Amino acid sequence: MSHSYKKAISDEALRPFQMDYFGGLPPGQYATRMTGQVHGSGCHLRSAPCDLGASQRKLSSNFSEIDAGLFSQGKSAAYTDIGATKPVEQRETAS
């Protein structure tokens, strides 16, 4: 059973997923490109220099705007019910 399981997820079977997810790069090469050259507050992503601090600030402000937009449409409450309230209720009833 163990042998057939390993055979089912061979490199040949995973190759299309690797091509899609990594854009044609082997996983190791992709990881090196993403994390290999990060030093302090600066980074090189796909051979283009960028300021990590500035990109982090931009991301956080974008997510805040998205969150505010979802909340105004009532979607944030639905996400909270699915993501937080139900697991908490299950833990409370179990204890």
Curated annotation (Swiss-Prot):
UniProt superkingdom: Eukaryota
Entry protein name: Putative uncharacterized protein encoded by LINC00526
The species this protein was found in: Homo sapiens (Human)
